[in-house]
Amino acid sequence: MGKFCCFTSASEVVGGQSSSRSGKGRSDEGMIKYGFSLVKGKANHPMEDYHVANFINIQDHELGLFAIYDGHMGDSVPAYLQKRLFSNILKEGEFWVDPRRSIAKAYEKTDQAILSNSSDLGRGGSTAVTAILINGRKLWIANVGDSRAVLSHGGAITQMSTDHEPRTERSSIEDRGGFVSNLPGDVPRVNGQLAVSRAFGDKGLKTHLSSEPDIKEATVDSQTDVLLLASDGIWKVMTNEEAMEIARRVKDPQKAAKELTAEALRRESKDDISCVVVRFR
């Protein structure tokens, strides 16, 4: 279990869990580098954003594991995902032959485990955006909620995740017996509570929510330069293009990640802010 868990070593981390932290790393060959930065928002609760950024070797393959988990109503669920989700994906027996199916199954099993342990984990929940890089050549990206993945390739910027919002998934929420509120001055919410339509956890709303991920793949080649994962603390105040401009311009990925979180603060983002920048060349 431990080899799948993706905490960065203390020598690579600056800051503490409660306020802000950043770090960096690279692949064994040193060709692919990553950096991350997390900053606590202005809300009066503990930091609810968690991340993964690590390279591991398993069965003669090098895997890059990157993720952002944005919790709500507590940090227990994103902390659980940080420890367990990638492990559960890689434990699927058919991962190496059918990554898409394995990722989908592991998302479902992990959500069921969270719901079964709600007495310990509470009734909160979390978004997730995960990226698995296989041997530096193939990317598998999955997400639930509004944490986002954006890829820069050949000068083009592509969003590799889907923002799961109540407004766009109203019909499926209503089919499950829920409703979408749309009060003046507020974003649409599931049953007047949750601003995302898919999430891990949220036991009290689960009958109206999905944890099924959207999954996309991409081939990494000489034209692929940057992958950016971030929570909505960035996306509420920056477009994909604005965020990627910083990620591409600042060549050191840790410095790029810190510049992104700093820019979100300058734009008065109130939420927890987190991002992982992966630079391929």
Swiss-Prot record:
Annotated disulfide bonds: none
**InterPro entries for this protein:** PP2C (IPR015655), PPM-type-like_dom_sf (IPR036457), PPM-type_phosphatase-like_dom (IPR001932)
Q: Which PROSITE patterns match?
A: PPM_2
UniProt: Mn(2+) 1 binding residues: 70-71
User: How many cofactor units bind, and how?
Assistant: Binds 2 magnesium or manganese ions per subunit.
**One Pfam family in the UniProt entry:** PP2C
* Main location (coarse class): nucleus
This protein's UniProt keywords: Hydrolase, Magnesium, Manganese, Metal-binding, Nucleus, Protein phosphatase
The PPM-type phosphatase domain extends over 33-280
Name its co-factor(s): Mg(2+); Mn(2+)
User: Could you tell me what reaction this enzyme catalyses?
Assistant: O-phospho-L-seryl-[protein] + H2O = L-seryl-[protein] + phosphate; O-phospho-L-threonyl-[protein] + H2O = L-threonyl-[protein] + phosphate
Write down the top EC class of this protein: hydrolase
Localization = Nucleus
Q: What is its EC number?
A: 3.1.3.16
Phenotype reported upon loss of the gene:
Abnormal hypocotyl elongation under continuous red light.
Segment forming the signal sequence = none
Gene Ontology molecular-function annotations: metal ion binding; protein serine/threonine phosphatase activity
Which cellular components does GO assign to this protein?
nucleus
What function does this protein fulfil?
Answer: Involved in the regulation of phytochrome signaling. May regulate phytochrome-interacting factor 3 (PIF3) through the dephosphorylation of phytochrome.
Name the family the entry cites: Belongs to the PP2C family.
User: How is the subunit organization of this protein annotated in UniProt?
Assistant: Interacts with phytochromes (via N-terminus).
Name of the protein in question: Probable protein phosphatase 2C 9
* Originating organism: Arabidopsis thaliana (Mouse-ear cress)
